[in-house]
């Protein structure tokens, strides 16, 4: 087992479980397949999901802070919502980072992709809950640069540069889409099957 894969597995162990109660391949086959709609995408606005990270809990930490706290590989700082420094592993591009300014919290299924996959029909409350979901494997700390490179792309057009992480990424993507009953495009489904082939 490579060092990259071992570190990725350590990080994923701290995150919500992938695939729920179904094997990923079974869950993938149950997803509705639909072509993407340019008309629906044209109506997408990030603000329909979130205008900032939600604060909740007794400590008042926001969602971003909670993701960084659970992903921090360094000893605790004693600060309830974490500090600006720590040690984070970005599994998409195999980088270890020590400054939160270098990090983004990625929506595994991007908000724009969720929108065209069915979230355009949801209530504002459901879209808000999706954007801040700490229960499913939807939020992961990664380097800012790799998150920018990913943008709103699905696996049909973007995959993590680290091939050893494809299996985890595909399972996470499928878990989120299956839970929220979001559709996939034919190319997206084909790409996910290919990525599951690395498991």
Where are these regions (language model features)?
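Residues that form generic nucleotide/phosphate-binding pockets
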Residues: 27-34, 43, 47, 66-70, ...
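Secretory targeting and sorting signals
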Residues: 1-19
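Short low-complexity stretches enriched in small and charged residues
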Residues: 21, 65-67, 98-100
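N-terminal module-boundary/linker segments of secreted carbohydrate-active enzymes
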Residues: 16-58, 186-188
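N-terminal carbohydrate-binding/catalytic regions of secreted carbohydrate-active enzymes
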Residues: 45-86
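Domain-level detector of nuclease and nuclease-like folds
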Residues: 88-199
């Amino acid at each position: 087992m490579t060092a990259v894969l071992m570190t990725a597995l350590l990080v994923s162990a701290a995150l919500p479980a992938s695939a729920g109660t179904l094997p990923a391949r079974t869950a993938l086959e149950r997803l509705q397949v639909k072509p993407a709609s340019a008309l629906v995408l044209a109506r997408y606005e990030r603000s329909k999901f979130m205008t900032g990270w939600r604060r909740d809990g007794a400590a008042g930490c926001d969602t971003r802070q909670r993701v960084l706290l659970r992903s921090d590989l360094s000893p605790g700082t004693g600060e309830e919502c974490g500090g600006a420094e720590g040690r984070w592993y970005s599994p998409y591009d195999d980088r270890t980072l020590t400054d939160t300014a270098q990090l983004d919290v990625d929506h595994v299924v991007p908000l724009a992709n969720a929108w065209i996959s069915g979230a355009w029909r949801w209530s504002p409350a459901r879209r808000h809950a999706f954007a801040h979901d700490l229960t499913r494997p939807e939020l992961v700390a990664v380097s800012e640069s790799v998150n920018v490179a990913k943008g709103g792309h699905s696996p049909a057009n973007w995959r993590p540069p680290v091939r050893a992480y494809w299996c985890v990424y595909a399972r996470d993507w499928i878990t989120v889409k299956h839970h929220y009953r979001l559709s996939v495009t034919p190319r997206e489904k084909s790409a996910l099957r290919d990525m599951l082939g690395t498991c």
